């Protein structure tokens, strides 16, 4: 048989977003005039003249030399250039047969 017990889940009471004091104050009419919002400094829909000015600025952006950055990154990580890897080429790794792998139970036990 499976055990059926009472659920321990209890929903949390909902909290109001604002304290009751502020809600009452917000509902009362005020004699103050509403503040006028400042117009945005830049419109989201630029005129054709503004678009042309922005496009001219984009032409001045220079693309960095990615190859030079890659070489610099390789030198900082390895202390040597990436192209130099000739010392690695041509070396033959020893066969796995030459290595003795310890069997289970051999070697020092660490307790």
Curated annotation (Swiss-Prot):
SMART domains the UniProt entry points to: GAGE
InterPro entries: GAGE (IPR031320), GAGE_fam (IPR008625)
Recorded superkingdom: Eukaryota
Pfam family, one: GAGE
Residue spans of biased composition, Basic and acidic residues class: 86-111
Signal sequence bounds: none
Region (Disordered) residue spans: 1-61, 77-111
Family: Belongs to the GAGE family.
Protein name: X antigen family member 2
Originating species: Homo sapiens
